[in-house]
Amino acid sequence: MHLKSFEVVQNVLTFLIIPFLGIIVGIASIPGVWMFLEARAYLVDQVYWLELFGTGISLGLACVVWGITLVLMSGLLGGLFRPRLEPGRYPLRSFVTIQWAWSMVFHRVAILFLPVLVPSFVGTIYYRMAGAKIGAGCQINSPHLNDAGSVVLGDGVVIGGNAIINAHLVEKGELVMAPVKIGKGALIGGNSTVQPGCTIGEGAVVANRAV
Protein backbone atom coordinates (compact mmCIF):
# COMPACT_ATOMS: atom_id res chain seq x y z
CA MET A 1 0.00 0.00 0.00
CA HIS A 2 1.48 3.33 -1.09
CA LEU A 3 1.18 6.34 1.18
CA LYS A 4 0.70 9.60 -0.71
CA SER A 5 1.74 11.70 2.29
CA PHE A 6 4.60 9.46 3.41
CA GLU A 7 6.88 12.33 4.46
CA VAL A 8 4.15 13.85 6.63
CA VAL A 9 3.44 10.52 8.33
CA GLN A 10 7.16 9.89 8.76
CA ASN A 11 7.77 13.30 10.36
CA VAL A 12 4.76 13.06 12.68
CA LEU A 13 5.75 9.58 13.87
CA THR A 14 9.35 10.69 14.40
CA PHE A 15 8.10 13.58 16.54
CA LEU A 16 6.00 11.16 18.61
CA ILE A 17 8.69 8.49 18.92
CA ILE A 18 11.29 10.78 20.51
CA PRO A 19 9.36 11.28 23.80
CA PHE A 20 8.31 7.62 23.64
CA LEU A 21 11.98 6.63 23.66
CA GLY A 22 12.52 8.86 26.67
CA ILE A 23 9.70 7.05 28.48
CA ILE A 24 11.26 3.65 27.73
CA VAL A 25 14.66 4.80 28.99
CA GLY A 26 13.02 6.27 32.09
CA ILE A 27 11.01 3.15 32.94
CA ALA A 28 14.12 1.01 32.48
CA SER A 29 15.95 3.21 35.00
CA ILE A 30 13.45 2.52 37.81
CA PRO A 31 15.18 -0.60 39.27
CA GLY A 32 18.57 1.13 39.22
CA VAL A 33 17.20 4.34 40.75
CA TRP A 34 15.47 2.33 43.48
CA MET A 35 18.70 0.49 44.28
CA PHE A 36 20.66 3.76 44.40
CA LEU A 37 18.14 5.49 46.68
CA GLU A 38 18.11 2.51 49.05
CA ALA A 39 21.90 2.59 49.20
CA ARG A 40 21.89 6.36 49.80
CA ALA A 41 19.45 5.98 52.69
CA TYR A 42 22.00 3.72 54.37
CA LEU A 43 25.12 5.69 53.40
CA VAL A 44 23.96 9.19 54.34
CA ASP A 45 24.77 8.66 58.03
CA GLN A 46 28.12 6.93 57.44
CA VAL A 47 31.59 8.43 57.69
CA TYR A 48 32.59 10.54 54.70
CA TRP A 49 34.94 8.08 52.98
CA LEU A 50 32.40 5.26 53.27
CA GLU A 51 29.64 7.49 51.93
CA LEU A 52 31.91 8.53 49.04
CA PHE A 53 32.88 5.01 48.02
CA GLY A 54 29.41 3.62 48.63
CA THR A 55 27.77 6.32 46.53
CA GLY A 56 30.20 5.75 43.66
CA ILE A 57 29.73 1.98 43.71
CA SER A 58 25.95 2.21 43.99
CA LEU A 59 25.86 4.66 41.07
CA GLY A 60 27.91 2.28 38.96
CA LEU A 61 25.73 -0.70 39.84
CA ALA A 62 22.60 1.35 39.18
CA CYS A 63 23.89 2.16 35.68
CA VAL A 64 24.53 -1.52 34.98
CA VAL A 65 21.06 -2.49 36.24
CA TRP A 66 19.56 0.26 34.07
CA GLY A 67 21.43 -1.01 31.00
CA ILE A 68 20.44 -4.64 31.46
CA THR A 69 16.81 -3.68 32.12
CA LEU A 70 16.79 -1.42 29.05
CA VAL A 71 18.15 -4.16 26.78
CA LEU A 72 15.70 -6.79 28.05
CA MET A 73 12.75 -4.38 27.82
CA SER A 74 13.74 -3.51 24.27
CA GLY A 75 13.99 -7.18 23.35
CA LEU A 76 10.54 -7.88 24.78
CA LEU A 77 8.91 -4.92 23.03
CA GLY A 78 10.79 -5.56 19.81
CA GLY A 79 9.58 -9.15 19.79
CA LEU A 80 5.99 -8.17 20.52
CA PHE A 81 5.83 -5.48 17.83
CA ARG A 82 8.04 -6.96 15.11
CA PRO A 83 6.25 -7.12 11.78
CA ARG A 84 5.46 -10.59 10.44
CA LEU A 85 6.43 -9.77 6.87
CA GLU A 86 6.86 -12.25 4.06
CA PRO A 87 10.19 -12.06 2.22
CA GLY A 88 9.88 -9.77 -0.76
CA ARG A 89 10.13 -6.24 -2.10
CA TYR A 90 7.85 -3.53 -0.76
CA PRO A 91 7.41 0.10 -1.85
CA LEU A 92 9.56 2.30 0.35
CA ARG A 93 6.76 4.83 0.71
CA SER A 94 4.33 2.38 2.28
CA PHE A 95 2.80 1.26 5.55
CA VAL A 96 5.12 -1.77 5.51
CA THR A 97 8.12 0.55 5.81
CA ILE A 98 6.52 2.25 8.80
CA GLN A 99 5.90 -1.14 10.44
CA TRP A 100 9.51 -2.15 9.85
CA ALA A 101 10.91 1.18 11.09
CA TRP A 102 8.76 0.95 14.23
CA SER A 103 10.18 -2.48 15.04
CA MET A 104 13.73 -1.19 14.56
CA VAL A 105 13.16 1.59 17.10
CA PHE A 106 13.52 -0.90 19.96
CA HIS A 107 16.80 -2.23 18.59
CA ARG A 108 18.15 1.32 18.40
CA VAL A 109 17.24 1.82 22.06
CA ALA A 110 18.92 -1.46 23.01
CA ILE A 111 22.13 -0.36 21.29
CA LEU A 112 22.56 2.27 24.02
CA PHE A 113 23.87 -0.56 26.24
CA LEU A 114 23.90 -3.75 24.14
CA PRO A 115 27.56 -3.31 23.03
CA VAL A 116 28.58 -3.74 26.68
CA LEU A 117 26.64 -7.01 26.95
CA VAL A 118 27.96 -8.91 23.93
CA PRO A 119 29.13 -11.59 23.99
CA SER A 120 27.12 -12.75 27.01
CA PHE A 121 24.00 -14.72 27.83
CA VAL A 122 22.15 -11.42 28.31
CA GLY A 123 22.88 -10.42 24.71
CA THR A 124 21.74 -13.83 23.49
CA ILE A 125 18.53 -13.57 25.54
CA TYR A 126 17.90 -10.14 24.01
CA TYR A 127 18.20 -11.45 20.46
CA ARG A 128 15.96 -14.42 21.21
CA MET A 129 13.34 -12.15 22.77
CA ALA A 130 13.51 -9.97 19.66
CA GLY A 131 12.69 -13.00 17.52
CA ALA A 132 16.01 -14.49 16.41
CA LYS A 133 16.28 -18.28 16.23
CA ILE A 134 19.60 -19.10 17.91
CA GLY A 135 21.02 -22.59 18.27
CA ALA A 136 22.97 -23.98 21.20
CA GLY A 137 26.49 -22.76 21.89
CA CYS A 138 26.38 -19.65 19.71
CA GLN A 139 28.74 -16.77 20.47
CA ILE A 140 27.39 -13.40 19.37
CA ASN A 141 29.96 -10.64 19.74
CA SER A 142 28.06 -7.94 17.88
CA PRO A 143 25.23 -5.52 18.68
CA HIS A 144 24.31 -5.37 14.99
CA LEU A 145 22.06 -8.36 14.32
CA ASN A 146 19.43 -6.20 12.70
CA ASP A 147 15.94 -7.55 11.96
CA ALA A 148 16.45 -10.26 14.58
CA GLY A 149 13.13 -11.88 13.75
CA SER A 150 14.48 -12.81 10.31
CA VAL A 151 17.82 -14.24 11.49
CA VAL A 152 18.46 -17.96 12.04
CA LEU A 153 21.73 -19.14 13.62
CA GLY A 154 22.58 -22.83 13.79
CA ASP A 155 24.35 -24.51 16.70
CA GLY A 156 27.85 -23.25 17.46
CA VAL A 157 27.78 -20.21 15.18
CA VAL A 158 30.29 -17.48 16.03
CA ILE A 159 29.51 -13.87 15.10
CA GLY A 160 32.68 -11.77 15.26
CA GLY A 161 33.00 -8.34 16.79
CA ASN A 162 30.84 -5.67 15.16
CA ALA A 163 29.76 -7.93 12.31
CA ILE A 164 26.57 -6.65 10.69
CA ILE A 165 23.72 -9.03 9.87
CA ASN A 166 21.00 -7.36 7.80
CA ALA A 167 17.73 -8.95 6.75
CA HIS A 168 16.75 -5.77 4.94
CA LEU A 169 18.10 -3.26 2.47
CA VAL A 170 16.75 -0.31 0.56
CA GLU A 171 17.29 -0.04 -3.18
CA LYS A 172 15.52 1.58 -6.12
CA GLY A 173 12.73 2.94 -3.97
CA GLU A 174 11.93 -0.41 -2.41
CA LEU A 175 12.39 -2.07 0.97
CA VAL A 176 13.81 -5.55 0.39
CA MET A 177 13.18 -8.09 3.15
CA ALA A 178 14.75 -11.56 3.14
CA PRO A 179 15.83 -13.85 5.99
CA VAL A 180 19.45 -14.64 6.81
CA LYS A 181 20.32 -18.25 7.67
CA ILE A 182 23.72 -19.25 9.04
CA GLY A 183 24.51 -22.95 9.32
CA LYS A 184 25.99 -24.90 12.21
CA GLY A 185 29.55 -24.07 13.19
CA ALA A 186 29.90 -21.16 10.77
CA LEU A 187 32.17 -18.23 11.61
CA ILE A 188 31.26 -14.68 10.64
CA GLY A 189 34.41 -12.57 10.89
CA GLY A 190 34.61 -9.29 12.73
CA ASN A 191 33.36 -6.16 10.94
CA SER A 192 31.99 -8.25 8.07
CA THR A 193 28.55 -7.66 6.57
CA VAL A 194 25.94 -10.30 5.71
CA GLN A 195 23.15 -9.00 3.50
CA PRO A 196 19.49 -10.08 3.28
CA GLY A 197 18.73 -13.40 1.66
CA CYS A 198 22.14 -14.93 2.41
CA THR A 199 22.36 -18.59 3.37
CA ILE A 200 25.76 -19.49 4.82
CA GLY A 201 26.55 -23.17 4.93
CA GLU A 202 27.64 -25.31 7.86
CA GLY A 203 31.23 -24.72 8.92
CA ALA A 204 31.71 -21.85 6.48
CA VAL A 205 34.06 -18.98 7.30
CA VAL A 206 33.34 -15.39 6.30
CA ALA A 207 36.56 -13.39 6.50
CA ASN A 208 37.01 -10.26 8.58
CA ARG A 209 35.55 -7.16 6.86
CA ALA A 210 34.07 -9.25 4.06
CA VAL A 211 30.77 -8.28 2.45
Where do the protein language model's features map onto the residues?
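Structural signal for interior beta-strand "rungs" in well-ordered beta-sheet cores
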Residues: 126-129, 133-211
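Terminal amphipathic alpha-helical/low-complexity segments used for targeting or macromolecular assembly
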Residues: 1-128
